[in-house]
Amino acid sequence: MSAKEVKFGVDARDRMLRGVEILNNAVKVTLGPKGRNVVLDKSYGAPRITKDGVTVAKEIELEDKFENMGAQMVREVASKSADAAGDGTTTATVLAAAIVKEGAKSVAAGMNPMDLKRGIDLAVEAVVADLVRNSKKVTSNEEIAQVGTISSNGDTEIGKFLADAMKKVGNEGVITVEEAKSLETELEIVEGMQFDRGYISPYFVTNADKMRVEMEDAYVLINEKKLSQLNELLPLLEAVVQSGKPLVIIAEDVEGEALATLVVNRLRGGLKVAAVKAPGFGDRRKAMLQDIAILTGGQAISEDLGIKLENVTLAMLGRAKKVMIDKENTTIVSGAGKKADIEARVNQIKAQIEETTSDYDREKLQERLAKLAGGVAVIRVGGATEVEVKERKDRVDDAMHATRAAVEEGIVPGGGVALLRASEQLKRIKTANDDQKTGVEIVRKALSAPARQIAINAGEDGSIIVGKILEKEQYSYGFDSQTGEYVNLISKGIIDPTKVVRAAIQNAASVAALLITTEAMVAELPKKNAAAPAMPGGGMGGMDF
């Protein structure tokens, strides 16, 4: 075990505070509409330019072990805010640094760190309650666009794209952000349920120009096992031919005699048919097939349920207004499933999302939810250079998470004003002793830090701006740093999602309170490089001539 270095008390807190300050100074310059960019050097490829607080924070690693501990703890604040709300990472970092700085002074003055922490916790509870009380529900598409614009640093085009995407796929729909190959940013909506499996044989193609299978008002057979012989299916196929409707077969695989027979029938025109492999693997495949069954109003044919292929009737098949299959994807539009059944399935998946601890599982469940609930929107971000595309994609990601958060918990005035207004409520908090009161006061001072920093980044005097905002009692009155005017922020569209602001203060206070109560720090001593062994002497040792 290597030797350790231990620091105590003021010395430990000072070193830690220095690390917090370094990280905060790098991150805070990105805050607000007039925030600056940060350039990150990469070990390979071009440097990355970003205005995203958490991306900057994740790059910071300090040489001094004790300073680095402070920086890493605050980096955790940014990461947690990104996980919880997807935005507000810079605000959270600025708040944490402000609380740590004030808290360290109070501890140095001899106050009880545990009472300070209790005071901080009381203050945060009051702030969260105030935010929730003043939160305004998002009702219009315009407000969603405003949230997107603010979170993407004033880019109205991004705000508009996000509002359109949310309108088309609904609040539960999935919005994915990709890099485009062109200069333009574009939005593509995939309606209905799409999964990443294409046709098994190109002979099923109906539209030769686009190499695509297009079927209107089709039956859908959902089978969990492989199909290699068609004997069991003949009665069903005859019934489908009689109905004159096309048939889509989704199965683990279709091969051999079964595939050959289907292709021959398709080419002769007797049966309009196409076969697709089932999506996913293992238990996830079973779940996805069940989703398709519920969406199309059919039954998944599975031997687990005691249903055999020879007993399948037309009534057990799903129906869809349109099915499109290309080489890589299958899209089912307007399935005939009952609305109540689909809603029940959606609620079941939501419950699974709440319970799961795996990020991968959560992502897959959210994809399934979107496919059932609304559809998928893809925003392809364009730009002149790779560096520009990456920077813009960062902002679109932030804005996307912010718009979701706004729909979830509503909005409050932006520009750090919601926290400033909440700070006024803290004067009324009753505490058990003076040290707890100081803890509340630490948070009260820290709550002005984001508004102050936004003003500083816009080239204004932060203290004067904060003072003027607090003079007026109107809740949404604040400073528009883009134009340099005092306005009603909500009617001007300068708004923040309540969830983002709430997550920022909760995460900042949680980590900052722990840093304040730190009394000792332990870090590994740097290893001393052992001296290189001496080179052997010249000549041939041990040989006498």
Swiss-Prot record:
GO terms for biological process: protein refolding. ATP binds at T30, L31, G32, P33, K51, D87, G88, T89, T90, T91, G415, D496. It is found in: Cytoplasm. InterPro entries: Chaperonin_Cpn60_CS, Cpn60/GroEL, Cpn60/GroEL/TCP-1, GroEL-like_apical_dom_sf, GROEL-like_equatorial_sf, TCP-1-like_intermed_sf. Keywords: ATP-binding, Chaperone, Cytoplasm, Isomerase, Nucleotide-binding. Pfam families: Cpn60_TCP1. Together with its co-chaperonin GroES, plays an essential role in assisting protein folding. The GroEL-GroES system forms a nano-cage that allows encapsulation of the non-native substrate proteins and provides a physical environment optimized to promote and accelerate protein folding. Belongs to the chaperonin (HSP60) family. This is Chaperonin GroEL 1.
